[in-house]
A protein has these predicted regions:
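Conserved GNAT-fold acetyl-CoA-binding loop/helix
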Residues: 26-50
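Conserved GNAT acetyl-CoA-binding A-motif
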Residues: 107-118
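Conserved beta-hairpin
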Residues: 58-72
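A short, internal acetyl-CoA/4′-phosphopantetheine-binding micro-motif in the GNAT/acyltransferase core
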Residues: 81-92, 119
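Conserved acetyl-CoA pyrophosphate-binding loop and the N-cap/start of the following alpha-helix
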Residues: 90, 94-102
């Protein structure tokens, strides 16, 4: 388990690093369940960067700093963990549990029930959330040309 980490609200100087972290993680981790064409489009279109920047401008983006570098990010939007990522080079070190615990803490301070979604094909994320005590809320209805997602819920 990690020994030192800080979860803090992202500031303007963090934005580029957070966008690069997301692109690296999507590129390395999402191809197996989204396919090469979808991942390439999402990264090259700027959609990933736009998603993070849009939430950053609303004050929803938090970063996980460890060993003087940003190793993870989460987006909290209402009672929802909209996005959570650990940089590909820092996965399987316990940082995901640290970031998820802080996100839960922040949301449970305001909401009794919290939620998140993940792609139905993202078996690593599904296993992680279940191991952290999240319950499947069910499969969400997929929109055309959009991969199916699973909702997870947790109650305070």
């Amino acid at each position: 388990m990690p020994t030192y980490a800080v979860v803090r609200l992202a500031v303007a100087d963090d934005l580029g690093a957070l966008q690069r972290l997301a692109r690296r993680t999507i590129d390395a981790s999402y191809r197996s369940f989204l396919g090469d064409d979808s991942v390439d489009w999402f990264i090259n279109s700027g959609a990933s960067d736009d998603h993070i920047e849009g939430h950053f401008r609303q004050g929803h983006v938090y970063c996980l700093e460890a060993e003087k570098e940003i190793v993870g990010l989460t987006i909290l939007d209402g009672p929802t963990i909209d996005l959570m990522m650990i940089d590909i080079g820092h996965q399987r070190r316990g940082w995901g549990r640290v970031l998820l615990a802080r996100a839960e803490e922040a949301l449970f301070a305001r909401y009794r029930d919290i939620r998140l979604e993940t792609f139905a094909g993202n078996t690593a994320a599904i296993g992680f959330y279940e191991a952290c005590g999240w319950l499947r809320g069910g499969q969400l209805e997929a929109m055309p040309e959009t991969p199916a997602k699973i909702e997870f819920v947790k109650r305070c």
